[in-house]
Amino acid sequence: MKANELREKSVEQLNEQLLGLLRDQFNLRMQKATGQLGQSHLLSQVKRDIARVKTVLNQQAGK
């Protein structure tokens, strides 16, 4: 996901996406804790996506 794509979305869409990413992060953390996570890179990828969405939300709130 790219920041340019996120800037085109509305605040409601960004909030929905943020909620979905937080759920994904929770599920990945649970898989890691139980030893079921085979692709550990997904944790950092989701973390970065969450940061991107939050950054765009803050930028839009400042306008």
Curated annotation (Swiss-Prot):
The keyword Ribonucleoprotein applies. The gene is rpmC. Keywords: Ribonucleoprotein, Ribosomal protein. GO terms for biological process: translation. HAMAP family: Ribosomal_uL29 (MF_00374). GO terms for cellular component: cytosolic large ribosomal subunit. InterPro entries: Ribosomal_protein_uL29 (IPR050063), Ribosomal_uL29 (IPR001854), Ribosomal_uL29_CS (IPR018254), Ribosomal_uL29_sf (IPR036049). This is Large ribosomal subunit protein uL29. The keyword Ribosomal protein applies. Belongs to the universal ribosomal protein uL29 family. GO terms for molecular function: structural constituent of ribosome. Gene3D superfamilies: 1.10.287.310. It holds the Pfam family Ribosomal_L29.
